[in-house]
Curated annotation (Swiss-Prot):
Free-text description of this protein's post-translational modifications in UniProt: Is synthesized initially as an inactive proenzyme. Formation of the active enzyme involves a self-maturation process in which the active site pyruvoyl group is generated from an internal serine residue via an autocatalytic post-translational modification. Two non-identical subunits are generated from the proenzyme in this reaction, and the pyruvate is formed at the N-terminus of the alpha chain, which is derived from the carboxyl end of the proenzyme.
Cofactor(s) the protein needs: pyruvate
Name of this chain's protein: S-adenosylmethionine decarboxylase proenzyme
Gene Ontology biological-process entries: spermidine biosynthetic process; spermine biosynthetic process
GO terms for cellular component: cytosol
Length: 382
């Protein structure tokens, strides 16, 4: 899963790729890009759409989708609502009316779009919503086209979805997200109750990361259960979830979990110089603090970014629109300082919120972590 580079890049070139200069070290031989690219495509079901939608397609279709971005399917689980796939680089979830594809490293996620559109056509669905997003790359100079620059990513997306709109959440020279949305939802619709919680964490506790190194590849077994118990991952993904996980060789770990219509996924890069973990779920709750505290308890990061998407009819969306706390606010995390917060409303009641936190003890120190945010005073809403 590791890549290496000894190419010298000047600051302007790196900024053109909208990464941070903090992580660039030409003497560092191996650095894995933990922050993922994420693509979600939702179809509108019509009278002509296959009754099982996208889940009617066999695994060979999804192997083709994943192969087009230079990854492979490693394991699979399913329930009544979701097909879950752990990949060589992160995860794929397939539901009746949507695909969620999350890939790390130097995968070329946008190259999968033609295959995905073919899959939608095969089940006679209509394209309703597309979102592509990723946090700023830790090692942008290692990416492959069309991900070598923001301009190339944007041009590729506009080619496929001409009416889509781009957004940037956060300071361009540190922790931020690029988001592109295509919206063809016919409103008012019957229900808009989706939700998404994503966390990216840097500077992980070394007492935890030591568990995610191995001299061999280990798939879901008593051995991976022991890893989950030792790291307290089993407090995040408990026995009510159907899970499949992978311990990579020489290091790295991925887990997917599904329960009815909900999913959780985590991916871990444990190397000291680029330690990183990501977490995502669509689990329904009116307040995320309990879940986020469990995740932070596993990784104990020096800093983290949380991004939340709230549909108006979701439990957390209703709480937000009623002026209640939703569990991402700084009062829930006294050991961290809020550095920056961005909120955007895409459509009536549909909100995206991104918040950067840094551990309190590290605020006055120089942050040397890969792709690091500038330490500083607490920020407020934009």
């Amino acid at each position: 899963m590791n890549v290496c580079s000894n190419t010298t890049k000047d600051p302007l070139t790196l900024m053109a790729m909208w990464g941070s200069m903090k992580g660039y070290n030409p003497e560092q031989g191996f650095s894995f890009e933990g922050p993922e690219k994420r693509l979600e495509v939702i179809l509108r079901c019509t009278l002509e759409t296959h009754v099982d939608g996208l889940r009617s397609l066999d695994d060979s279709v999804w192997s083709g989708v994943v192969g087009s971005l230079n990854a492979q399917i490693v394991s699979r689980e399913s329930n009544e609502y979701i097909n879950s796939y752990v990949l060589t680089e992160s995860s794929l979830f397939v539901m009746k009316n949507r695909i969620i594809l999350i890939t790390c490293g130097t995968t070329t996620l946008l190259n999968s779009i033609p295959n995905i559109l073919e899959a939608i056509s095969a089940v006679r669905g209509e394209l309703e919503w597309v979102s592509f997003m990723h946090k700023n790359y830790s090692f942008p100079w290692m990416q492959k086209g069309p991900h070598t620059s923001l301009a190339d990513e944007f041009a590729t997306l506009k080619q496929h979805f001409p009416t889509g709109k781009p957004y940037i959440f956060g300071p361009v020279d540190s922790d931020h997200y690029f988001l592109f949305c295509y919206d063809d939802i016919i409103r008012p619709c019957s229900s808009e109750d989706d939700t998404q919680l994503s966390m990216t964490m840097y500077g992980l506790d070394k007492e935890q990361t030591k568990h995610w190194f191995s001299d061999r590849f280990i798939s879901t077994s008593a051995e991976t259960a022991a890893i989950r118990a030792a790291t307290h991952l089993d407090r995040v993904v408990d026995g009510t979830w159907t899970l499949h996980d992978l311990q990579f060789e020489p290091c790295g770990y991925s887990i997917n979990a599904i329960r009815d219509e909900e999913y959780q996924t985590m991916h871990i890069t444990p190397e000291d110089h680029c330690s990183f973990a990501s977490y995502e779920t669509n689990s329904r709750a009116a307040n995320y603090s309990d879940r986020m505290k469990k995740v932070l308890g596993v990784f104990r990061p020096q800093r983290f970014t949380v991004i939340v998407f709230l549909d108006p009819e979701s439990p957390v969306g209703k709480a937000y629109n009623e002026g209640k706390g939703i569990g991402v606010e700084p009062e829930y995390y006294p050991e961290y300082n809020l550095l920056h917060r961005t909120t955007n409303e895409f459509a009536p009641g549909y909100v995206a919120m991104k918040i950067n936190y840094v551990r309190t003890a590290a605020v006055e120190e120089t942050d040397t972590a890969v792709g690091g945010a500038e330490p500083g005073a607490e920020g407020g809403p934009d």
